[in-house]
Amino acid sequence: MAENKMRIKLKGYDHAIVDQSITKIIQAAEGTGAKVRGPIPLPTEKQVITILRAVHKYKDSREQFEMRTHKRLLEILNPTAATMDVLKRVQLPSGVDIEIKL
């Protein structure tokens, strides 16, 4: 038996905001009677940028900055039209990127 799945992938730089957004989506989806699988934590991307502190020489003096992207996956099994309508209305913080696949 094939079942419909909606996959929601959230990305953000702050893990607390991503987790807070996931709980909002789970509460909204479960309110319509849909089954929710997750949240599944995906590997965190870490981007390290190294720059020289001095302008001309002194290569030994460097500074490193890093940017971490936290990701979570959520699956909603057999979503109804009401589930999709509720998910469109969920207000998420500005630091979260959402990607929905059916």
Swiss-Prot record:
Keyword Transport in the entry? The reply is: no
The terms under GO molecular function for this entry are: structural constituent of ribosome; tRNA binding
Give Gene Ontology CC terms.
ribonucleoprotein complex; ribosome
SUPFAM superfamilies listed in its UniProt record:
Ribosomal protein S10
Top-level taxonomic group: Bacteria
Family matches, as SMART domains: Ribosomal_S10
Asked if the Swiss-Prot or TrEMBL record annotates the protein with the keyword DNA repair, the reply is no
Pfam families listed in its UniProt record: Ribosomal_S10 (PF00338)
Keywords noted in UniProt: Ribonucleoprotein, Ribosomal protein
Q: For this entry, list what GO says about its biological process.
A: translation
Query: NCBIfam families from the xrefs?
Result: PRK00596.1, rpsJ_bact
Q: What does this protein do?
A: Involved in the binding of tRNA to the ribosomes.
The record's note on quaternary structure and interaction partners says: Part of the 30S ribosomal subunit.
What protein family is recorded? Belongs to the universal ribosomal protein uS10 family.
* PANTHER family in UniProt: 30S RIBOSOMAL PROTEIN S10 FAMILY MEMBER
- Name-wise, this protein is Small ribosomal subunit protein uS10
* Species the sequence originates in: Mycoplasma capricolum subsp. capricolum (strain California kid / ATCC 27343 / NCTC 10154)
Gene of this entry: rpsJ
